[in-house]
């Protein structure tokens, strides 16, 4: 959706230009010595690939990747899974029916059912955080949990992945394609927007409007009118149930993920990222009261975004979000996940905090 800088996958003919753009971005981030080291690392990796391909042409893809990258296979596989999920979403969008009122009503029912399932999940009671507690830093990292889980990113610290060129380029590609962000200035502008305005303000406008026409310019085309009508109907359906502040999870969760991505790419320092996550943490704790409510907020905002995009594959998107949130709240059968369960939400603060 153009509203969030979310564009379709680049055509094959643009691959070379994209690769050059990634090099230019990295050139803006690193000094000459680091760029030389990066170029040397990439050259050595390319040499390894060419040599191994020549020696192992008879191997299958999985065996060849394992031979080439050894213990780095896990993070590379994560990148491939992310790309596969994006491809599946694009295929579903191509096969999905046109966006109409019937589909809209189905999505409302799906959202209500999914949010009810999230509400029924067990979660530890919120606990007090001291103002100078390390718990806030951990909480800030975990606010990126849904997108991190979908992308198989680490939630152990600020870094989302291991610092190897293939993953740095993959993250830069995600941020550029999904958000239209290519550097520090654009990153900070978007984080400011999400933390100060975002969908909280947008949803408020939709709730207050008496008709979709109040949201449009006089010369708006038919597509813009349909988009405004979908957003307005969404807000009118839910405005008595959810106040604008309920959108905080959707805004804060994405801002936290952008903060970690930006730090990973070197666009902001770790100290700057920690400060941004602190501010986002305070906003989340003020507006929401549990990880379940945070997850519900993310689903709520996610559907509004898909309605604005006119994406008929919105149901699949809600499924990805719900699965990620469930894994974070209760964990998986293999005992992984459960990061939100293991770090309870901050209890309401006393006066004088």
Please state what every model-predicted region is.
Residues 1:
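Cysteine-rich micro-motifs
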Residues 6-270, 279-353:
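Polar/charged low-complexity regulatory segments
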């Amino acid at each position: 959706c153009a509203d969030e800088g979310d564009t379709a996958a680049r055509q094959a003919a643009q691959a070379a230009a994209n690769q050059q753009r990634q090099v230019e971005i990295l050139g803006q981030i690193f000094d000459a010595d680091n760029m030389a080291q990066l170029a040397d690392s990439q050259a050595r990796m390319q040499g390894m690939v060419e040599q191994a391909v020549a020696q192992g042409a008879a191997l299958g893809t999985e065996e060849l990747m394992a031979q080439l990258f050894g213990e780095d296979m896990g993070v590379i596989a994560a990148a491939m899974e992310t790309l596969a999920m994006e491809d599946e979403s694009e295929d579903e969008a191509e096969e999905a029916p046109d966006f109409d009122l019937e589909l809209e009503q189905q999505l409302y029912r799906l959202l209500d059912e999914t949010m009810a399932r999230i509400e029924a999940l067990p979660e530890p009671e919120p606990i007090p955080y001291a103002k100078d507690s390390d718990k806030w830093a951990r909480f800030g990292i975990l606010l990126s949990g849904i997108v991190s889980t979908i992308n198989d990113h680490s939630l152990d610290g600020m870094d989302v992945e291991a610092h190897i060129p293939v993953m740095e380029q993959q993250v830069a590609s995600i941020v550029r394609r999904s958000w239209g962000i290519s550097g520090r200035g654009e990153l900070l502008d978007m984080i400011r927007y999400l933390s100060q305005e975002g969908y909280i303000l947008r949803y408020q406008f939709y709730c207050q409007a008496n008709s979709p026409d109040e949201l449009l310019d006089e010369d708006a085309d038919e597509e813009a009118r349909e988009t405004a009508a979908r957003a307005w109907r969404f807000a009118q359906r839910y405005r008595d149930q959810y106040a604008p502040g309920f959108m905080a999870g959707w805004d804060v969760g994405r801002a936290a993920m952008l903060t970690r991505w930006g730090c990973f790419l070197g666009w902001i320092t770790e100290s700057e990222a920690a400060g941004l996550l602190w501010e986002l943490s305070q906003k989340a704790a003020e507006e929401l009261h549990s990880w379940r409510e945070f997850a519900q907020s993310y689903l709520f905002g996610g559907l509004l975004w898909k309605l604005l995009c006119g994406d008929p594959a919105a149901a699949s998107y809600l499924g990805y979000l719900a699965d990620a949130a469930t894994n974070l709240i209760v964990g998986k059968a293999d005992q992984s996940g459960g990061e939100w369960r293991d770090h309870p939400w901050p209890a309401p603060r006393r006066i004088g905090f």
